[in-house]
From Swiss-Prot:
Belongs to the LpxH family. GO terms for molecular function: manganese ion binding; UDP-2,3-diacylglucosamine hydrolase activity. This is UDP-2,3-diacylglucosamine hydrolase. Its cofactor is Mn(2+). Mn(2+) 1 binds at D8, H10, D41, H197. Mn(2+) 2 binds at D41, N79, H114, H195. GO terms for biological process: lipid A biosynthetic process. GO terms for cellular component: cytoplasm; extrinsic component of plasma membrane. It catalyses: UDP-2-N,3-O-bis[(3R)-3-hydroxytetradecanoyl]-alpha-D-glucosamine + H2O = 2-N,3-O-bis[(3R)-3-hydroxytetradecanoyl]-alpha-D-glucosaminyl 1-phosphate + UMP + 2 H(+). It is an enzyme of class 3 (hydrolase). It is a peripheral membrane protein. Hydrolyzes the pyrophosphate bond of UDP-2,3-diacylglucosamine to yield 2,3-diacylglucosamine 1-phosphate (lipid X) and UMP by catalyzing the attack of water at the alpha-P atom. Involved in the biosynthesis of lipid A, a phosphorylated glycolipid that anchors the lipopolysaccharide to the outer membrane of the cell.
Length: 240
């Protein structure tokens, strides 16, 4: 058996091929898993669980079908869908997890997270993140009419795209020291995360021993998953 991890699908109505690929994954590979973990940015944007977007409800139904088949599904918020709440979790059958979570998998302790908090050199983003994660700001935003939330979200996405275009690739990647610190805080030798869209397996030293950081790829032209079994940890890219 295996435990599967995915992240950064950025599902949206404008990208039906990615949606179809995700549905195929849920109905195929995922059905034989011990569990599925989605490490953030399942959706390109999320303005509230009350958004009537048919895509959201279709995906909730598809995930619920997986859960009902006996495969539990867990979710860590990303920087695009951090407002996913208990209502969508109930509809989809997913279990919401904290930003940093340690799993015991086949004899390994594995830290999982979205990965945006590791990009500590991007101080502008971290300042923005702190603001939008403030509870009263979220409460105020979710109280606004949907059409206003849509406008705000669109403006924020455009601003983020413009800001990122002028940032160096190094700034938008993880800070190596931040990686070591979080692994040592949780006393783990394995870390799986997404966010950077740079799939790879990195070797490092943490807790005075060899350690491994596995980065999931984004679902653009192909799918990306990490498969953890009793035999090892594998990063896999696959066609939709």
């Amino acid at each position: 058996m295996a435990t599967l991890f995915i992240a950064d699908l950025h599902l949206q109505t404008e990208e039906p091929a990615i949606t179809a690929g995700f549905l195929h994954f849920l109905q195929g590979e995922a059905r034989s898993a011990d569990a599925l973990y989605i490490l953030g940015d399942l959706f390109e944007a999320w303005i509230g669980d009350d958004d009537p977007n048919p895509l959201h409800h279709d995906m909730a139904a598809a995930i619920k079908a997986l859960v009902d088949s006996g495969v539990p599904c867990y979710f860590i918020h990303g920087n695009r869908d951090f407002l996913i709440g208990k209502r969508f979790a109930r509809e989809s059958g997913m279990t919401l997890l904290p930003d940093e979570n340690v799993l015991e998998l086949y004899g390994r302790n594995v830290l999982i997270m979205h990965g945006d908090t590791l990009c500590t050199d991007d101080t502008g983003y971290l300042a923005f993140r702190a603001k939008v994660h403030t509870p009263w700001i979220q409460t105020l935003f979710l109280a606004l009419p949907l059409f206003i939330r849509n406008r705000i979200a669109a403006k924020m996405r455009a601003g983020s795209k413009a800001a990122n275009s002028s940032k160096s690739m190094t700034i938008m990647d993880v800070n190596p020291q931040a990686v070591v610190e979080v692994m040592e805080k949780h006393r783990v030798q394995w870390l799986i995360h997404g966010h950077t869209h740079r799939p790879d397996v990195h070797q490092l030293t943490a807790n005075g021993e060899p350690a491994h950081r596995v980065v999931l790829g984004a679902w653009h032209s192909e799918g990306s998953m990490v498969k953890v079994t009793s035999e090892g940890v594998e990063l896999i890219q696959f066609p939709f």
